[in-house]
């Protein structure tokens, strides 16, 4: 196993089981980064973006914030892309959305993952990406957020609908969802947005899931925005808005691991 001395392996395993004091949390982070480096997943001391392959059911981009944030149990932000970014070339995922904004200089105080699918989003496979992050980094599991656009908007609501107990909040842009998930989604703070002139995905797709949520609890955790005169592509600008990230990061959810 990368030529690790047996005593070092025992030591690292021991550290991972110790109480999460600030000292041990920091040592755990260093140990995990050491292991990741063994598999070719290496990072410098500052915020870094790295493609990850063969570690989950999807290949994905992994963004680690600066060390000072990483050592303080950062939240997790999952970005699910739309159909135009589908395929097996991860560079496509940089065309718009959260990863694009990071590359333009946006500082996001979270571990960010942006998986790529070639044929629609499977919430179980998305969960495998989240599981990788939870296993390898000392993140705040009470602050897991999901955001997606178009097909990624559907993926966001499908993931939150299947795993509502794991999602602190989610934003779905010009997508839709399964009305059977309405009552599960009603327990998650959601911001659903759709343009009134969207011809690629009609606004009725969002309206259906909004009604399903409202029928469960009146939509007490729901924020719905119908953007008058906006078409499908107009929603991309939300990734450039501070408001999106500020809204998401205000929420927490107690997760029973």
Question: What positions do the PLM features span?
Answer:
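Primarily recognizes the serine-hydrolase "nucleophile elbow" in alpha/beta-hydrolase
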Residues: 143-184
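A domain-start/cap signature at the N-terminus of enzymes
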Residues: 2, 8-9, 22, 43-76, ...
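C-terminal catalytic histidine-bearing segment of alpha/beta-hydrolase fold enzymes
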Residues: 181, 199-200, 204-257
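Sec-dependent N-terminal signal peptides
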Residues: 30-39
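Active-site machinery of serine-nucleophile hydrolases
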Residues: 76, 80-125
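Gly/Ser-rich "nucleophile elbow"/oxyanion-hole loop immediately N-terminal to the catalytic nucleophile
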Residues: 67-72, 121-150
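Short beta-strand/loop motif that positions the catalytic acidic residue
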Residues: 192-194, 198
């Amino acid at each position: 196993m990368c030529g690790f001395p047996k005593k070092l392996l025992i030591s690292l395993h021991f550290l991972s089981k110790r109480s999460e004091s600030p000292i041990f949390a920091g040592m755990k982070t260093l140990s995990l980064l050491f292991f990741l480096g063994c598999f070719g997943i290496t990072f410098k001391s500052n915020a870094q973006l790295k493609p990850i392959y063969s570690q989950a059911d999807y290949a994905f981009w992994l963004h680690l914030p600066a060390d000072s944030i990483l050592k303080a149990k950062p939240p997790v932000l999952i970005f699910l892309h739309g159909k135009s970014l589908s395929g097996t070339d991860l560079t496509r995922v940089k065309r718009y959305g959260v990863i694009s904004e990071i590359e333009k200089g946006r500082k996001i105080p979270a571990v960010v993952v942006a998986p790529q699918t070639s044929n629609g989003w499977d919430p179980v496979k998305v969960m495998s990406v989240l599981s990788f992050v939870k296993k390898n980094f000392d993140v705040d599991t009470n602050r897991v957020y999901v955001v997606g656009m178009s097909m990624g908007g559907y993926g966001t609501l499908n993931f939150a609908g299947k795993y509502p107990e794991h999602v602190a909040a989610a934003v779905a842009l010009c997508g839709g969802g399964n009305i059977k998930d309405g009552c599960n989604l009603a327990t998650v703070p959601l911001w659903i947005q759709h343009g009134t002139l969207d011809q690629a995905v009609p606004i009725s797709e969002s309206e259906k899931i909004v009604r399903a949520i409202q029928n469960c609890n009146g939509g007490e955790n729901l924020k719905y925005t119908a953007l008058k005169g906006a078409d499908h592509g107009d929603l991309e600008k939300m990734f450039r808005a501070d408001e999106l990230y500020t809204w998401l990061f205000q929420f927490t959810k107690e997760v029973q691991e």
